[in-house]
């Protein structure tokens, strides 16, 4: 592959370890800086009340990310170390699904059902752009729910996953020629309602 995808394997692999320090990344998802607005956002109530609803909202997003990477792997658009790195990304998203599912159950809730998804996978550059959008959105989504989470344990887990999503996004942003320098001292959160609207085109049922 030519251009920005040549170093995909090296860049993605470097950002994949949970032992790495957290990285911030820019987002272009229409986010807001208002913590009050985030705390007032009740869009996750459709998934359940309180922390369970927030966890199920996050679980739904992780379902989408896991399905996306699975489809990319099947597409064979990437080869060699590039494909291996994408497989690693997908594996980490699948681990998030397991962790969130287990947490919902431990809190006495019912995990959200897995939606059927469909993603446009036309060529490698387009897939990288879509992956960057998905990962930036995921990172912003977790941060957006931080003010609403009541349990310290759930908050710690959510921020840990947010860190991984941010590193995924930073790697993809680099390959797309976007700056790796954050556009401010604080990462930008995203309201659940906006995030759900953004991913709706990928959900077919």
Regions flagged by a language model, labelled:
Residues 4, 8-11, 17-205:
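All-alpha RGS (Regulator of G-protein Signaling) helical domain and cognate RGS-like helical scaffolds
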């Amino acid at each position: 592959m030519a251009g920005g995808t040549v170093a995909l394997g090296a860049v993605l692999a470097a950002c994949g370890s949970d032992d790495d320090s957290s990285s911030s990344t820019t987002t272009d998802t229409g986010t807001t800086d208002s913590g009050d607005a985030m705390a007032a956002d009740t869009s996750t109530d459709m998934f359940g009340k309180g922390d369970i609803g927030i966890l199920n909202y996050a679980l739904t997003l992780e379902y989408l990310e896991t399905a996306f990477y699975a489809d990319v792997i099947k597409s064979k658009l990437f080869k060699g170390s590039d494909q291996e790195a994408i497989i690693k990304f997908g594996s980490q998203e699948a681990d998030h699904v397991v962790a969130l599912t287990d947490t919902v159950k431990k809190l006495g809730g019912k995990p959200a059902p897995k939606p059927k998804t469909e993603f446009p996978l036309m060529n490698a550059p387009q897939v990288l752009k879509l992956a960057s959008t998905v990962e930036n959105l995921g990172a912003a989504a977790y941060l957006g729910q931080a003010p609403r989470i009541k349990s310290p344990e759930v908050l710690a887990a959510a921020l840990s996953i947010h860190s991984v999503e941010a590193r995924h996004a930073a790697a993809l942003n680099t390959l797309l020629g976007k700056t790796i320098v954050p556009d401010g001292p604080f990462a930008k959160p995203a309201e659940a309602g906006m995030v759900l609207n953004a991913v709706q085109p990928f959900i077919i049922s």
